[in-house]
Amino acid sequence: MSVLVNKNSKVIVQGFTGSEGTFHAEQMIAYGTNVVGGITPNKGGQTHLGKPVFNTVADAVKATGADVSIIFVPPAFAADAIMEAAEAGIKVIITITEGIPVSDMVKVAAYIKNRDCRLIGPNCPGVITPEEAKVGIMPGFIFKKGHVGIVSKSGTLTYEAADQIVRQGLGITTAIGIGGDPIIGTTTKEAVELLMNDPETHCIVMIGEIGGQLEPEAARWIKANGNKKPVVSFIAGETAPKGRTMGHAGAIVGGAEDTAEAKKRILRECGVHVVDSPAKIGEKVKEIMSK
């Protein structure tokens, strides 16, 4: 089992013929992801990387039956690309683009609210189900199949956690990079819930950071639902000064509850295994899964 993407996912690339879209589509195809085509307006009818190019998502869905899209569209046009994918019936929309205006994402959130689709991102590394499908920009060779799910706001810390888990002789079911922007399509809690409901996932790693209340919200949900599976967490930004964004637009300490210290306290109170250094994630997972 896996969540969001697997070997049967039919993936299209929006922004297919641009430099980013081309580079990462090549990597995804090489990984074995079932990329069935891509979108670049006014280039429909051409082929690119041996796959058909379409003018619209609707055309691509009609021709290929695509159900997953990955978006490499520039920030000014990315919100329209997300809404176009939702309108065309794409079930999982993974948005890599960073720098989409918050006002645009407010519109997107309202637009997709009652639609049967799930947005991952924006400003995220994507989703990988090892040895089945990589829909994102992560280095696929780090990930091996196993029973640990990862939910993360940070791309690089996702790769670090996966590498440590694999070095401990374990593996990953699905890793979900939810994105570091203030408005994202899938929250930490929602991603954790997907993995809690996946029978193949026996342990979850939750990587968060300062700013917002996504991790405490997830922790309270985990506790309210009986701590069914062990969750290991690391919160980045321990030494961040108040009021300054740290790397991600959403990583800013506003109120007292936004600090790493406050979040870690809440997580521990909810029965989550918190580590104080990212270097300890793999060890902690191994320790818990050996019990």
Question: Across the structure, where does each feature detected by a protein language model lie?
Answer:
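Catalytic-core regions of core metabolic enzymes
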Residues: 1-291
